[in-house]
Amino acid sequence: DPLYTKFVSLVKSDPVIHTLLPLSPKGEICDINGVCVDAAEDEFFRLTTKEGKLTVERDVVRTKTTDYSPILQFEQDPVQILDALLPLYLNSQILRALQESLASELAARMSAMSNAAA
């Protein structure tokens, strides 16, 4: 879970924790051939505060799974699709966090310089 400063406006930035993986808490999803895309019993880790101190909470997601409809067909195996998209997703989310952090830093610098000049 990356922690970054989300750019809201020129005068406001918010600290944000964004979960990258697992993609969703829906558990295991299997196609008609029995090939599973996500794993049941996924673990989520949340960074929280308890009594003024940072702590990590661990949670296991338990959900019921449903199979795809036999009418639904994939041109490629869902696992191959996910394997191809996962690096692109991670790269885009990390790049977005870096860009928002940079925008927040530049806005804070502009604000500090305008306050110093006044």
UniProtKB/Swiss-Prot annotation:
**Recorded GO MF terms:** proton-transporting ATP synthase activity, rotational mechanism
Its subcellular locations are: Plastid, Chloroplast thylakoid membrane
Gene Ontology cellular component annotations, sorted alphabetically = chloroplast thylakoid membrane; proton-transporting ATP synthase complex
Main subcellular location:
plastid
Could you identify this protein by its name? Answer: ATP synthase subunit gamma, chloroplastic
> What S-S linkages are listed for this chain?
C30-C36
Q: How does it assemble?
A: F-type ATPases have 2 components, CF(1) - the catalytic core - and CF(0) - the membrane proton channel. CF(1) has five subunits: alpha(3), beta(3), gamma(1), delta(1), epsilon(1). CF(0) has four main subunits: a, b, b' and c.
Keyword line: ATP synthesis, CF(1), Chloroplast, Disulfide bond, Hydrogen ion transport, Ion transport, Membrane, Plastid, Thylakoid, Transport
Any idea what job this protein has? Produces ATP from ADP in the presence of a proton gradient across the membrane. The gamma chain is believed to be important in regulating ATPase activity and the flow of protons through the CF(0) complex. Inceptin is a proteolytic fragment produced by insect larvae that previously ingested the protein. This peptide mediate plant perception of herbivory through the induction of volatile, phenylpropanoid and protease inhibitor defenses such as ethylene, jasmonic acid and salicylic acid for example.
Q: Does the keyword Coiled coil apply?
A: no
Protein topology in the membrane: Peripheral membrane protein
Question: Zinc as a keyword?
Answer: no
What family does this chain come from, according to its entry?
A: Belongs to the ATPase gamma chain family.
